[in-house]
A protein has these predicted regions:
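Active-site glycine-rich loops that stabilize anionic/oxyanionic intermediates
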Residues: 25, 33-36
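Catalytic histidine-centered segment of alpha/beta-hydrolase-like enzymes
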Residues: 264-273, 277
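Flexible "cap/lid" subdomain of the alpha/beta-hydrolase fold that forms the substrate-access gate
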Residues: 1-8, 15-20, 27, 39-40, ...
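Residue-level recognition of oxygen-bearing side chains
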Residues: 15, 36, 275
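Short amphipathic alpha-helical segment that frequently serves as the phosphate-/nucleotide-binding helix
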Residues: 35, 247, 277
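Short amphipathic alpha-helix adjacent to the substrate-entry channel of hydrolases
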Residues: 39-55
Length: 288
């Protein structure tokens, strides 16, 4: 897994950040979602290296082997702004002033915040299986609350930690035949770590509070993404079923939007890596 990649922990303003990086050429950052680590990209990253990119895959703060800051009352220590600053600082440390940026699931919210906060650094932005948090919350109904109940369960204080850490393997399921054994082993190690569980829950708590407020402030100010945006979603997940065309939502946030569905379940990097890598390579090529 990640043959010929370097694995290291980089200190980013006091936040230890675990990262895998390899290849040569324009830099592209891949940000994982919940409850995964950077290992989720193990089938996509080598294909992007072969296509001529430097590929950087960090563990987000609170996840995997990266920093586990103490929770704060306002959840700002686990905000997407804080996580985005980690990624921006990591790329500076690795010598990349500008880069392409890809995020999946919770990593998409970090990528969106990074593109909003540091637009000059992001050449192209690809967001997988997401619409903005504030757009989800503006559309909450019984169907969303039933399917995505974990958003609201995770927001509760204390109870989710007790429930999940009592039997993490039951809460977080995975199939090594689909994920790949090494990816699965890393995922299982992470989800059995109470510090990781707390960090992941704080990610969701920040989402409903400080992250939502930042997005709503962006919209009130008329902020728009100016870099090209690719939105991809899993056809066997429920984003399209819940909201129709996700591109219609993203056009309120970005001036240059394109995208399509991919025949996959939610974890497309593991389930449809070649199709995903092809879509990213086409989008990230200089002529796109």
């Amino acid at each position: 897994m990640f043959e010929n990649f370097t694995e290291e922990v980089v200190d980013v303003a006091g936040a230890p950040t675990f990262v895998r990086h390899g290849g040569a050429g324009p830099a592209v950052v891949l940000l994982h979602g919940h409850p995964r680590t950077s290992a989720t990209w193990h089938r996509v990253a080598p294909q992007l290296v072969s296509a001529g990119f430097t590929v950087v895959c960090p563990d987000l703060r609170g996840y995997g082997r990266s920093a586990k800051p103490a929770p704060t009352a306002d959840h700002s220590a686990h905000s997407k702004r804080a996580a985005a600053a980690d990624v921006a600082g990591l790329m500076t440390a690795l010598g990349h002033e500008s880069f392409d940026l890809v995020g999946h699931d919770r990593g998409s919210y970090v990528a969106l915040r990074l593109a909003m906060d540091h637009p000059a650094r992001v050449r192209r932005l690809a967001l997988l299986d997401c619409i903005p948090i504030s757009e989800h919350l503006a559309r909450v109904n019984a169907e969303f609350a039933t399917r995505w109940f974990h958003w609201f369960f995770f927001a509760q204080s204390g109870t989710p930690e007790r429930v999940i850490t009592a039997d993490p393997d039951a809460w977080y399921s995975g199939d090594p035949a689909v994920m790949g054994q090494e990816n699965y082993d890393e995922f299982r190690t992470a989800t059995r770590d109470p510090a990781v569980v707390r960090g992941m829950l704080e990610d969701y708590r920040a989402g409903l509070t400080v992250d939502r407020a930042l997005e709503e402030s962006d919209r009130a100010a008329g902020a728009m993404l100016r870099m090209p945006l690719l939105a991809l979603w899993s056809l066997r997940d429920d984003l399209e079923e819940l909201y129709g065309d996700p591109l219609a939502i993203w056009r309120d946030w970005a001036v240059d939007v394109r995208g399509h569905g991919i025949d996959s379940g939610h974890h497309m990097a593991e389930e449809a890596p070649s199709e995903l890598a092809a879509a990213l390579t086409e989008f990230l090529s200089p002529a796109s």
